[in-house]
C-alpha cells in the first residue's frame, strides 16, 4: 500500500513539474481552443447602420459633421510630418500629413495617460482619467498571474516591467472601466441632435453600462479580436517578436467584430480596410444630417500583420518587421485618405 502511494505521489509530482516547466507552451496550446469554445465566431454578418434623411431632401441644418480618427500605438515619428516618418523617412503618410497641413497641428500635444484604456477614457470624457479612478488598462484576473510567468522567461532587456503590488490591488476585470456616470462627447452630441456612430476599438470596460451604446453611440461596430486577418490568410504577411508576451498576443487573437452588441462575426477583409469601408457607409448614409463618427482604428497595435500588397511596396527596407510595420501604417494612411475624399464630397 505504501509503495502504491509512493508511486502515485511520485507520478503526480513528475506531472506537476513537467506542467510547470512547460507552462508557457501549454498555455499557448490551450488558449485558442478555450477561446473558440467560449466565444465562437460566425461568418461575416452585414452591418445595418442607421440612415439619415433621403438624399432628395434639401439639407437646412448647417451644423458641422465631426469625424474623430484615432490610431492605436502609433509612434510620434511614424508619420512623415514628424521628422521624416518611419524607416528613416522612406515611408510617407501624405493623407495624415494633409490634415495638419490644412488644419491645426498640435505639435506639443500629450496623452492624458501613458496606457491605452485610460487615455481613451480621457478622449471620450475630456477629463484626466485619474479624476475618476481609471488609471490602468483592464487585464483579466487570471492574466495578472499568467503574464508574470511569461515575462520571467523573456530576455531581461525586452522583459515587460510589472508592479505586482499594484496589479494585485486592482479591482476585478469586470469592474474596471470608465465609470458609467461620466459624460462622453458622444452623449453630449447625441443630446444635441447628432447621429453618433462608433467603429473599432472601445476598451472602456465590460460591465453593464460601459459599452459604446450605453455611453452615447447609437450604433457601434466593435473590435472583438486582435487579428487583422487569420494568420494563415494568403493576403497577409506576419511579423513576430521573440518574446512570450508577443506569443501570447498571437495565441489569444481572434478575427472578430460585433455590431450593436450582437454575435461575434468575421470581418470580410483586412481589419483596417474593413473599418474604413464601414466608416464610408456611415458617411454615405448620414450625409444629410449632422453626425459624429468615432473611427477608432486597431492599427497599428500588435500583432504585426500587413497586407502583402502593402509589404511589397516596402522592399527597400532590409528589416522584415519594419516592412510589415510600415505596411500597417500605409494602410492606416490609405484609410484617412478615403475618409477625407468622401468627406469633401458630402460634408
What are these language model-derived features?
Residues 1-4:
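Positively charged n-region of N-terminal signal peptides that target proteins for export
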Residues 7-20:
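Hydrophobic membrane-insertion alpha-helices, especially the h-region
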Residues 31-104:
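Active-site-proximal N-terminal segment of extracellular/periplasmic enzymes that hydrolyze or transfer
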Residues 87-120, 126-131, 193-197, 218-224:
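Short, structured active-site-proximal loop/turn typified by the sulfatase FGly-forming signature C/S-X-P-X-R
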Residues 139-195, 202-291, 297-306, 312:
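Formylglycine-dependent
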Residues 331-342:
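Active-site neighborhood of glycoside hydrolase catalytic domains
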Residues 345-347:
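Conserved small/polar residues in nucleotide/adenosyl-binding loops
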Amino acid at each position: 500500500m505504501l509503495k502504491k502511494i509512493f508511486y502515485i505521489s511520485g507520478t503526480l509530482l513528475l506531472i506537476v513539474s513537467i506542467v510547470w516547466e512547460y507552462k508557457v507552451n501549454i498555455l499557448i496550446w490551450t488558449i485558442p481552443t478555450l477561446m473558440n469554445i467560449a466565444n465562437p465566431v460566425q461568418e461575416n454578418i452585414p452591418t445595418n447602420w442607421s440612415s439619415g434623411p433621403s438624399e432628395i431632401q434639401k439639407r437646412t441644418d448647417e451644423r458641422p459633421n465631426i469625424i474623430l480618427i484615432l490610431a492605436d500605438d502609433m509612434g510620434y515619428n511614424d508619420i512623415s510630418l514628424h521628422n521624416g516618418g518611419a524607416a528613416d523617412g522612406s515611408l510617407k503618410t501624405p493623407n495624415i500629413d494633409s490634415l495638419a497641413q490644412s488644419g491645426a497641428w498640435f505639435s506639443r500635444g500629450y496623452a492624458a495617460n501613458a496606457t491605452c484604456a485610460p487615455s481613451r477614457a480621457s478622449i471620450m470624457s475630456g477629463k484626466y482619467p485619474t479624476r475618476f479612478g481609471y488609471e490602468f488598462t483592464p487585464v483579466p484576473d487570471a492574466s495578472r498571474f499568467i503574464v508574470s510567468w511569461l515575462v520571467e522567461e523573456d530576455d531581461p532587456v525586452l522583459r515587460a516591467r510589472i508592479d505586482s503590488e499594484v496589479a494585485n490591488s486592482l479591482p476585478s476585470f469586470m469592474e474596471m472601466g470608465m465609470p458609467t456616470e461620466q459624460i462622453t462627447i458622444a452623449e453630449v452630441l447625441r443630446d444635441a441632435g447628432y447621429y453618433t456612430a462608433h467603429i473599432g476599438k472601445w476598451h472602456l470596460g465590460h460591465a453593464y453600462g460601459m459599452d459604446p451604446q450605453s455611453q452615447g453611440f447609437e450604433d457601434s461596430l466593435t473590435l472583438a479580436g486582435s487579428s487583422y486577418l487569420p494568420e494563415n490568410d494568403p493576403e497577409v504577411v506576419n511579423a513576430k517578436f521573440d518574446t512570450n508576451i508577443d506569443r501570447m498576443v498571437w495565441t489569444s487573437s481572434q478575427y472578430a467584430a460585433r455590431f450593436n452588441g450582437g454575435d461575434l462575426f468575421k470581418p470580410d477583409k483586412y481589419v483596417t480596410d474593413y473599418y474604413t469601408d464601414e466608416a464610408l457607409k456611415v458617411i454615405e448614409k448620414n450625409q444629410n444630417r449632422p453626425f459624429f463618427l468615432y473611427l477608432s482604428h486597431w492599427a497599428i497595435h500588435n500583432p504585426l500583420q500587413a497586407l502583402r500588397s502593402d509589404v511589397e511596396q516596402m522592399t527597400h527596407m532590409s528589416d522584415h518587421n519594419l516592412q510589415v510595420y510600415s505596411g500597417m501604417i500605409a494602410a492606416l494612411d490609405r484609410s484617412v485618405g478615403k475618409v477625407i475624399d468622401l468627406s469633401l464630397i458630402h460634408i
